[in-house]
Amino acid sequence: MEEGGRSPREEAAEPQESGGDAEPGGGRRALLLPPGDPPHPHPHPHRITNFFIDNILRPEFGRRKEAGGTAGEPRRPGAESRRSPAAAAPAPGAPVPGGGGGGGGGSPGRGEGGPAALALHGAAKKGGDPAALEAALKARGLSGAELSVSSDSDSSQAGSNAGNQPMLWPAWVYCTRYSDRPSSGPRSRKPKKKNPNKEDKRPRTAFTAEQLQRLKAEFQTNRYLTEQRRQSLAQELGLNESQIKIWFQNKRAKIKKATGSKNSLAVHLMAQGLYNHSTTAKDGKSDSE
């Protein structure tokens, strides 16, 4: 038999001995693969990790063992806090926790922008060691610029989602004594003038003796003037209607304070203990006030 010729039994046994590692261009490799999948030039090597449920649930998962410590030695609670954050970053060749899932290497598209890369980024920022960050990112095939872009896009997406939600008002807005509407808000006081002008106040009316005598006589007749009677008095005394009206109001208030008589509503409220504003009359006031 010639050297180039092979029996069918040898050709069938050759793929089993090689374990499927034939060249990509060979016809035998193409026949073994499904028709839809292209041949992979460099398949990912199978990596054994400790990502079991029991290991993940342990408190020491993801922490590197302390130098000089044994597996059976109990961990001290203050030992982890004394280590620097830069020591938590893995070496360039070491496997990064969280990158692979339960089946080994994991997909590259899923692990590039995952939470493990963000955790590495934050740990290196706190530790202030950019070299450790770059080494860890290169081990995962990710650069710092891509990580920053992905984190910015995540933050912008979170901001847009928050903007779509209706704005919620805090509870204290609805508990104010001003109003239950948030649009009203707290009332602002008007600023007081430092130098009040005398023109802002209403000028006091200086009644003559004849005018006072006529007003007192009219008050004895009727304490409440009608509009026609007020107009006629204003024409007779040469005063404004507002001046006569204010004088009658002040006169009634003085008599009410002097006598101490209260209306029926005040008496009813005082009986219930809701009103007890006692007033005293002040002497020495002239009638011109």
From Swiss-Prot:
Localization: Nucleus
SUPFAM superfamilies hit by this protein: Homeodomain-like
Single biological process term from Gene Ontology: central nervous system neuron differentiation
Protein name (database record): Homeobox protein engrailed-2
Any matching Pfam family: Homeodomain
The gene coding this protein: EN2
One annotated Gene Ontology cellular component of this protein: nucleoplasm
DNA-binding region(s), chain positions: 200-259
Segments of skewed composition (Basic and acidic residues): 1-12, 60-83
Keywords, sorted A to Z: Developmental protein, DNA-binding, Homeobox, Nucleus
Species in which this protein is naturally found: Gallus gallus (Chicken)
Signal peptide stretch: none
InterPro entries in alphabetical order: Engrailed_Homeobox_TFs, HD, HD_engrailed, HD_metazoa, Homeobox-engrailed_C-terminal, Homeobox-engrailed_CS, Homeobox_CS, Homeodomain-like_sf
Biased composition annotated in UniProt, kind: Low complexity: 142-160
